[in-house]
Every structure is written in structure tokens, then in C-alpha cells.
Amino acid sequence: MNIWEIATNYYQYFLRGTRTTILISLLTVFCGSILGCLIAFMRLSKFKPLEKFASIYITVIRGTPMLVQLYIVYYQLDFISYPTGTLFDVDLERALACIIALSINSSAYVAEIIRAGIQAVDKGQMEGARSCGMTNAQAMRYVVMPQAVKNILPAIGNEFVTMVKETSIIQYLGIGDLMYNNGIVVTSTYNPLPCYYISAIIYLALNIILGKGLNIFEGRLRKSER
């Protein structure tokens, strides 16, 4: 079978896998952004134990392979009781393990993105807000963060693009993402090369679409600064 025949005869597998890949990526970036925001503020904290914990957390997560983290989380969940079932036709136990592991991994990178975005804001902004009678929390909320967000959001968008590709490791837990379904088609056709070409094209198309969306978003952010 050639690439066109495989694409037309097995398109439902590729579509199903693409849906799962996008879903896991969205949930991962959402959860990772929330956790990353918390870690970033801990990293910026003047309370040394919190700052130290965040620093160690980021070092450990960024310094170990994502696949190892995925297996650790998956086997660790065996000791935790939680609801069983399915999430969009995906086994809930495995889906939770993937979302948790990928979110933890993403949070370490998001934390550094947020920290860098906040530190990129001129320190005079904070000092000016404080001189106007604002507390640290008020100055951060009303003065620093609105400016930092313009630096942070495009980078988090790039993290989403990266995560779409990195979710390919969840196939090792039997999650029906794009690469898992690609494997099913390879087994059925005994012709792996066209299958991998199709998967590569889908990943490329997803990232091009996301990249274009990010460019439009960044353009609007720049216009709002004028």
C-alpha cells in the first residue's frame, strides 16, 4: 500500500490519535501553567525555604528524562485511590498519569518563563507603584503582571507547540495518541515508512497552525503596546 491508500483506508486511526494528542497537550499546558505559576512565585520568594525548594524542583525536573518521570508517576499512582473509568475513550488511570507527569515536566519550564517575564519588567515600575502607596501584592497584580504577561504568553504558546510533539512518549503507556495509532496502522499494513510520513505531516501541520496562531497573537500584543 502506498501513502495515499494508507491515509484513505486508515484515516480514522490518525484522526483519533490526533484528537487524543491535542486533548492531552491542552490539559497538560493548562495544568502545567497553573503549577508553573506557583513554582515561579516560590522561585521569586524572599522566603529562602520556598525559593530553595522551587530551585531544586526546577533542576530535578529539567535534569531528568520525561519518559522516566512518566513511568515514576504511573507506578506511583498504584498507591493512590482515585476514580476509574475512561476519559474520551482513554483509560482514566493512564490518562491521569500522562497528564500529571507531562504537567510536572511542563511546569518547570513554564516557571522559568514566568520568572524571566516578571524579571524583565523594569524594577522602577515596582518602586514607582510602592511609592504610590501600593503593597507588594497590589503592585505585582496591577503594575508588574500586566506588563509581564506580554512577555510570558508568547513563550507559553511556544511551550504548547513543544508539548504537542513531546506527547508522543505517552504511547509507551498505551494511550491512543497519534504515535500509538500510527503503530496500529504499521502493524496492519506491514509498511511503516508511509505511516511515519503521515504522522510527521500531521505533527507538522499542527505545529504550523499553532505557530501561525501564535504569530497573530503576538502581533496583536505588539499593537496593544502602541
Region locations from a protein language model:
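Transmembrane alpha-helices and adjacent helix-loop boundaries
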Residues: 1-226
